[in-house]
């Protein structure tokens, strides 16, 4: 038996354990406190769009901006700083890192407390990066999958589906409702990619998507429109991709476009990279680019789901603009949620910048309303599903 098969067998056994322990009397209905006081989701005579409109109409500007942010927090419990960000800055979404995660039991308690502390009428998205290989959380407490490169080299897309299902079940059991995976980049050398052939990468991304959907957890395709060609780590510095638009469509974009065409786009998000793609926009990184986010992804490819930026604290963008401006630029480019992963001060600057721009008209109110409606609708559709299934 190969190492990959042995690891996969362990994953399937673990998934079975999670399935037997996660029935209606355990995580469903407790992780996400949707109830009469929190939402109007039980207004049976209203359509989903009417419910969404009712919730959004009742939101303040501050609450709307909070829904358009996903922030990192410090500590393994709900600290005073975290409580302040949830209640004063109305943060609507959280991303967790190893600094927040010590054990499955502790994470479940943390996510439950975060949802209880959440003052919004809809639950928090609580996300992690659990790709496999080197990019995993709680490596010593969870059965981490191998790298996507290793999975891709197996030649069997069903393997990707099984790993995604197992990871999804583990995360859901801890109250995490979104995983920023699979990586849809095309690269023959990057261990985070399923491979260097775009059609092969799509088959594995497609299979992984079905795995996450079977586990009833949101997932995120990244890093649009593809960072497989870059030799520079965008955590550290900016990078420019000079590949032509037509070549990007014939290769790098295939895993994204085909997955969008074959899956319900309300069940996943697309995370946009910080690279510059001169074929689409020679001036702005993708995360701040109207031609890429709105013209290409939203209008050209007709993507209806949520668009999230990569972390705004990465070196690829921090040297170019202030944090107050970065959030404004991302929202005006068409992003629905701005990701800021580490420093409370930076998170506050991004929030303050977006709120000020909304109030003085630099961000059109319709731009914010459209995003918040999409966020609320997807939360009602899929986080509420965890209770009702």
Residue positions per predicted region:
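A substrate-binding/cap region within the structured catalytic cores of diverse enzymes
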Residues: 148-209, 213
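Active-site mouth loops of central-metabolism enzymes
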Residues: 68-78, 148-162, 238-251, 313-321
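Glycine-rich, aromatic-flanked loop segments that form ligand/cofactor-binding clefts
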Residues: 115-143, 163-183, 209-225
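Hydrophobic faces of well-ordered beta-strands that scaffold small-molecule active sites
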Residues: 65-73, 92-96, 124-130, 178-181, ...
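Second-shell residues forming the walls of enzyme active-site clefts
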Residues: 60, 102-116, 134-136, 196, ...
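Preference for extracellular/luminal or secreted protein segments
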Residues: 5, 21-89, 300, 319-389
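Bacterial N-terminal signal peptides
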Residues: 10-18
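Bacterial N-terminal signal peptides that target proteins for export
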Residues: 1-8
């Amino acid at each position: 038996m190969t190492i990959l098969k042995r690891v996969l067998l362990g994953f399937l056994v673990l998934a079975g354990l999670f399935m037997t322990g996660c029935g209606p009397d355990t995580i469903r209905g407790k992780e996400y406190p949707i109830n009469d006081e929190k939402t109007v989701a039980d207004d049976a005579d209203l359509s989903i769009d009417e419910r969404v409109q009712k919730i959004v109409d009742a939101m303040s500007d501050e609450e709307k901006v909070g829904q358009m942010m996903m922030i990192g927090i410090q500590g393994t419990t709900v600290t005073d700083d975290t409580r302040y960000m949830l209640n004063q800055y109305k943060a609507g979404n959280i991303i967790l890192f190893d600094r927040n995660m010590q054990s499955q039991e502790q994470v479940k308690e943390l996510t439950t407390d975060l949802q209880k502390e959440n003052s919004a009428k809809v639950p928090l998205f609580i996300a992690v990066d659990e790709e496999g290989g080197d990019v995993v959380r709680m490596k010593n407490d969870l059965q981490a999958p191998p790298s996507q490169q290793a999975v891709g080299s197996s030649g069997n897309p069903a393997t990707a589906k099984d790993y995604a299902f197992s990871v999804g079940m583990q995360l859901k059991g801890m109250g995490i409702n979104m995983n920023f995976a699979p990586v849809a980049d095309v690269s023959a050398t990057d261990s985070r990619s399923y491979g260097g052939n775009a059609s092969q990468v799509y088959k594995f991304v497609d299979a992984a998507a079905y795995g996450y959907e079977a586990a009833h957890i949101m997932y995120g395709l990244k890093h649009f429109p593809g960072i497989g060609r870059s030799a520079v780590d965008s955590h550290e510095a900016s990078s420019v991709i000079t590949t032509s638009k037509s070549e990007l469509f014939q290769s790098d974009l295939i895993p994204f476009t085909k997955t969008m065409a074959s899956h319900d786009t309300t069940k996943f998000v697309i995370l946009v990279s910080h690279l510059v793609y001169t074929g689409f926009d020679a001036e702005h990184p993708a995360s701040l680019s109207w031609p890429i986010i709105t013209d290409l992804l939203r209008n050209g490819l007709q993507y209806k789901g949520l668009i999230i930026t990569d972390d705004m604290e990465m070196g690829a963008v921090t040297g170019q603009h202030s944090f107050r401006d970065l959030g404004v630029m991302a929202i005006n480019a068409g992003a629905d949620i701005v990701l800021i992963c580490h420093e409370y001060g930076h998170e506050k600057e991004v929030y303050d910048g977006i709120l000020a721009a909304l109030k003085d008209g630099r961000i059109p109110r319709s731009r914010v309303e459209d995003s918040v409606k999409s966020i609320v609708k997807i939360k009602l559709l899929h986080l509420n599903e965890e209770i009702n299934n």
